[in-house]
Regions:
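A short SAM/SAH-binding and catalytic strip from SAM-dependent methyltransferases
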Residues: 1-9
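SAM-dependent methyltransferase
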Residues: 7, 28-98
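A short glycine-rich, Lys/Arg-flanked "PGG" loop and its adjoining helix->strand segment in the class I
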Residues: 10-26
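Solvent-exposed loop and beta-edge segments used for protein-protein assembly and interaction
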Residues: 23, 63-65, 124
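C-terminal lobe and adjacent flexible extensions of AdoMet/dcAdoMet transferase-like proteins
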Residues: 90-143
Length: 143
């Protein structure tokens, strides 16, 4: 969900999910947080072994809460040559309040935001797990 960079897109995805949930069905997803993106900040990372090497250039705009990164991979082929792959990604750090509003706007009920241990998410949580529920639409009757 972090790849959705606009609030309206988050609402639309939640609406689409809600359309396909069974009555009282559960929607569970995870998000990287502002805390996580701040922790990696504007840094470069690299690693190499015999089969794959990568360079990751990261940039986090704290005001917009947009994380941008360029990733260059070198993957060894069967003939021992390396093929280069370049990728560019943007992700957004939505606040829990934004997610709650998007879920409620889409017609679902926001249940909780927890960390990897099942405890309530805090400002220091790197990845938050969101749990929402469909409100209980009436199932279609047999024809």
């Amino acid at each position: 969900m972090n790849y959705l960079t606009e609030y309206d897109d988050l609402v639309n995805v939640c609406r689409l999910v809600n359309n396909y949930l069974d009555p009282n069905g559960i929607f569970l997803f995870d998000l990287k947080t502002d805390h996580y993106f701040k922790s990696i900040g504007c840094q470069s990372f690299c690693d190499a072994d015999e089969e794959v090497s990568f360079i990751w250039d990261n940039d986090y705009d704290e005001e917009k809460r947009i994380n941008s990164y360029a990733l260059t991979l070198f993957v060894q082929e069967e003939d021992n040559r390396y093929e280069r792959f370049d990728e560019y990604h943007e992700q957004r750090a939505f606040s829990i309040d934004e997610v709650r509003c998007a879920i409620e706007e889409s017609g679902m009920i926001f249940l909780s935001a927890i960390d990897k241990n099942g405890a309530p998410a805090t400002k220091d949580t790197d990845r938050v797990y969101i749990i929402a529920r469909e409100k209980g639409k009436t199932p279609l009757q047999n024809l």
